[in-house]
From Swiss-Prot:
Biased composition (Polar residues): 62-77
Organismal lineage: Eukaryota, Metazoa, Ecdysozoa, Nematoda, Chromadorea
Alphabetized Pfam families for the sequence: F-box-like
Name this protein carries in UniProt: Uncharacterized F-box protein C27F2.7
Region listing for Disordered, in residue ranges: 49-77
InterPro entries: F-box-like_dom_sf (IPR036047), F-box_dom (IPR001810)
Keywords assigned: Ubl conjugation pathway
Claim: Protease is one of the keywords in the record: no
Ranges that cross the membrane: none
All copies of domain F-box, residue ranges: 124-170
Length: 408
């Protein structure tokens, strides 16, 4: 009996010693793998250990302050990345003795991290090689600015963005302007999207309609310029449609080309197919964003309303001009007085600069009666009459809101 108990005690001691030996072997393995992973990471990141001859040489030369200092080339992000790699490396070989036999497909070797990196590098391919469905799924995780940048890389991605732009938000873009001109060589009207502060090397977007030049996932807050010989009525419906879709917000409308008029040969953007009432209604629908309208064209619509509705737009604009029209348009004192009275009584009026021809029947005393101050005037060399060039009128109850007339 005593012999059996002694054997049992010896077997227990042997079992205990065996467990201790296993733990010691596992601890040695962990320490070995830890040192191996540390050396590998130091080698990949080009970090020398403190005990290396290079570090000791720098320390003796007075450069020891650079080692481990916050101003070293190794940033915090790289340190955290190194720590994550080290933890992944340690977790891979620490879990391998336990789960390696149970799940060899997931724990095929202790060096899982670097093996997966090698496999992924062999499977890498370019972004444009992805199917369109995968690219669209990636686009669903991007914000409006990232989608806008993606659409400006190439035509293929631009078309994909255009096909899925209804499912994302819009970003305001103010860096470009739209120009509609007639190409004399190809005999067609073209729409161009140009940078506001551009050079000759900047890229241009050209299309036969306004929608084709607008960037996907954007809302264009822009100036629209109609150049000479362009029929404006062909573009009004598209502008209103894009405005309703919240894709286009015109801030300024410029109708140019009137300066090229010589004698009876009128030039400029063609507004003769639209009436005065239709034009005022078009400007009203673009409020409250539209700030400027410049009618610098000779091909203007006829003033058909009495009194004219054209001057009434000064209450909703910040700048309004009507020059180069043929035949010359001169407003009368009564029409100007009514427009000023409407502007002074409107609580939504803005500061506005009006550029127009000098009226014939308005004297300096008449401007003063309208509560205006004459800023600039000159003497007519032929009649010795005082000609008012600029006048400023204050608002009735809004402070720092002025109406300035510039006459020519």
């Amino acid at each position: 009996m005593a012999v059996q108990q002694k054997r049992r005690g010896l077997s227990f001691i042997d079992a205990k010693a065996s467990n201790v030996k296993k733990i010691a072997v596992m601890a040695s393995t962990v320490a070995f793998e830890f040192n191996k992973a540390t050396l590998r990471l130091r080698r990949s990141l080009h970090i020398s250990p403190r005990s290396s001859p290079e570090v000791q040489r720098k320390a003796t030369a007075g450069e020891n302050s650079e080692v481990g200092s916050p101003e070293s080339s190794l940033s915090t992000s790289r340190c955290s990345k190194r720590d994550r790699k080290l933890c992944a490396e340690l977790s891979s070989f620490a879990l391998y003795p336990i789960f390696g036999a149970l799940s060899p497909s997931h724990f095929s070797s202790p060096n899982l991290l670097f093996q997966s990196e090698k496999n992924s590098s062999r499977r890498s391919f370019e972004f444009m090689q992805l199917p369109d469905t995968d690219i669209c799924q990636i686009m669903s995780f991007l914000d409006a600015q990232s989608l806008l940048n993606l659409s400006q890389t190439c035509s293929h991605l631009r078309q994909l963005c255009l096909a899925h732009e209804d499912n994302a938000g819009k970003r305001d873009v103010t860096s470009h302007e739209i120009t509609i001109s007639f190409n004399q060589i190809h005999r067609r009207t073209e729409v161009r999207l140009l940078k506001r502060e551009r050079t000759r090397t900047d890229r241009q977007f050209i299309s036969n309609n306004i929608r084709g030049v607008l960037a996907p996932f954007s809302r264009a807050l822009t100036k629209i310029t109609f150049e000479t010989t362009v029929f404006v009525t062909d573009w009004l419906d598209e502008i209103l449609q894009l405005h309703r879709e919240n894709r286009l917000i015109p801030l300024s409308l410029l109708f140019t080309g009137g300066a090229l008029t010589k004698g009876h040969q009128v030039t400029g953007a063609d507004l003769r197919s639209i009436t005065e009432t239709e034009f005022v209604d078009f400007v009203t629908k673009l409020q409250p964003h539209l700030q400027e309208v410049q009618l610098s064209t000779s091909r203007i619509f006829k003033i058909s309303t009495d009194p004219s509705q054209l001057l009434g737009m000064i209450s909703m604009l910040s700048s309004f001009g009507i020059v180069y029209e043929r035949p010359p348009l001169h407003f009368y004192h009564e029409e100007i007085s009514n427009a000023i009275a409407l502007w002074k009584s409107d609580p939504l009026s803005r500061c506005c600069d009006v550029y127009m021809r000098r009226p014939h029947d308005v004297s300096s005393e008449s401007w003063i009666k309208l509560a205006g101050s004459i800023d600039e005037s000159r003497i007519d060399p032929y009649t010795d009459e005082v000609l008012v060039s600029q006048i400023t009128i204050k608002h009735s109850f809004l402070v720092h809101i002025d109406l300035v007339f510039h006459f020519h």
